[in-house]
From Swiss-Prot:
It comes from Rhodopirellula baltica (strain DSM 10527 / NCIMB 13988 / SH1). The lineage of its organism: Bacteria, Pseudomonadati, Planctomycetota, Planctomycetia, Pirellulales. GO terms for cellular component: cytosol. The gene is trpA. This is Tryptophan synthase alpha chain. It is an enzyme of class 4 (lyase). GO terms for biological process: L-tryptophan biosynthetic process.
Amino acid sequence: MTPLQSLFESLRGQNRKALMPFLTTGDPNIDTTEAVIAAARQAGADLCEVGVPYSDPIADGPVIQASYQRALDAGFKLQHVWDLGQRLTENPKVKAMPRVTMVSYSIIYRIGMAKYVDQAMQAGYCGAIVPDLLVEEAEDLSKICREKGFDLIQLVTPTTTRDRQCRIAELSSGFLYYVSVTGITGERTALPTNLVDNVGWLREQTELPICIGFGISGPETAAQLAPVSDGLIVGSAIVRRVADAVEKAKSSGADPVKTAAEEAGDFCHSLRQAIDAA
């Protein structure tokens, strides 16, 4: 059983939904990323998604694109993702929290599928979300991941045909990432009216947990989606708060790392309360 399988089995036994924050590696530096993840964990996050900055992101909106660019401008290298993983493994506040990478398939392909999985596992990651992996090209990576006990998480969107949804589910493990809205990542106040029906149909096709991401702007949208899902993925809303907190701290002379961690922790705490009350 993989760490993600164990986590979701435990959460189901507690009738609890997963809270999964997304953070960009190295925005603005590794110290901040580690501190924010630790604060999110203490505030009730169950697992985390670690973004691998890429110069040509496929599904990311302006907030995460800007975050990736800041990390790249600061000299990001893939080794920083592995360094962060090792630091999280050694950090008593977060070492038990499962973590996955959000990574472009082009990076995996360039390194080599087996090599990427090996490096990720050595750094303490238990899975990868690959947003630009076509289902027609997923079989080889899925096989490697299953053989190594590493979860491959794929995206299902509102416009994915039902046949493709079933095939994606067959080639995925850990959980399915259901994209709540069409388009790119970002905060939204209104969610599609057919979301409940779409997720309900998908749930009948697979035993995998279904986590919902894209468009979760705060506690209100989290509370709306919690009853439908097995977990919620919150990216842009957290990344924006971290960036704003860092800038605010710089202008006031405060500690940027501490300020960003406190801001992210407070926000995750509000999400946790809303999810648990839904």
